[in-house]
Amino acid sequence: MEFTGGCVCGGTRYVLKSRPLALVDCHCIDCRRSAGAPYVQWGSVPREDVVMTKGEPRKIAYANRIRSFAACCGTHLFFEDAKDSDTIDFTIASLDDPTPFAPQKAIWLEDKLPWVVIDESLPSFHTTPKKV
């Protein structure tokens, strides 16, 4: 099964060759600030399962993390840990159809904005658990 996604203007497109391994709502301040949102929902897939089909994202490295944005319009697309080359995270909202991908965990609740309501049925973590 494949899943397609891309940026807001259509200049950058990708295909995921597998279902996400993890679906996480991240409330950390870095994700909030880079996305301009109260939190970001990430999916994780094996690196080899991400295929760019149009355009190439611009990568910005900071604090052992690499965030990738559409060079054409700035849409936040990917997140990589500089030390973990096995997986890559993608923004669920950048999928053409994000509806099947409900969150499985909430992380970095120590940075959560006070008015954000967390689904109490989700496993929640103060920071990042060992395996997300």
Predicted regions mapped to residue ranges:
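A short Gly-Trp-Pro
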Residues: 1-132
